A protein has these predicted regions:
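Conserved PLP-enzyme active-site core in the AAT-like
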Residues: 61, 69-169
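PLP-dependent aspartate aminotransferase-fold enzymes
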Residues: 3-92, 99, 109-110, 118
């Protein structure tokens, strides 16, 4: 049923929480691409690659944070700058299709949390251009906006998607 409803779903793997889902997605992207760097925006749990870039980074070796790079939500230029800087060694782009932690849009509007000016379509295009796995973290958005996740609403199909919360409650 899930495979029929979610645009990117060809297979489904269940885990116990959203943190495990995003960890597995990033690990899979690294395995498939043989690349190291992760480009992200938004919140993605407590795994070392993400939390190493926050103020709660105690106990995480610097070497881990060297492979994680934050870009600004709704800012295509900040993402492409990272894709250029780490070209040939980017495993994935992971983001929440609607950001709950990136409150300011750097494009035109203020306090924007929803994609502006085709942002998600541009992210998809950049992922294809640079041969990078695109992951939507739909832990919060999945099944709340649509049975097919926010990807169904916005018309952008990621390579991988992570769902949690609404599917279990």
């Amino acid at each position: 049923l899930i495979v029929k409803r979610i645009p990117c779903a060809e297979m489904v793997r269940f885990g116990k929480n959203g943190n495990d889902a995003t960890t597995l997605a990033v690990r899979l992207a690294r395995h498939v691409t043989k690349n190291n760097n992760i480009l992200f925006c938004g919140y993605h749990g407590w795994q070392d690659w993400y939390i190493s870039k926050t103020s709660m980074n105690g106990g995480i070796p610097n070497e881990i944070s060297n492979y994680s790079h934050r870009f600004a939500y709704n800012d295509v230029e900040s993402l492409e700058n990272l894709l250029i800087k780490f070209k040939g060694d980017v495993a994935c782009i992971i983001l929440e299709p609607i950001s709950k932690v990136e409150p300011i849009c750097s494009v035109k509007c203020k306090h924007c949390k929803i994609s502006c000016d085709g942002f998600l379509k541009k992210v998809r295009w950049l992922a294809d251009k640079y041969k990078v796995v695109l992951i939507f973290d739909e832990v919060v958005t999945g099944f709340r906006w649509s049975i097919g996740g926010y990807q169904e609403v916005c018309g952008v199909t990621p390579d991988l998607a992570c769902f949690s919360k609404a599917i279990a409650n």
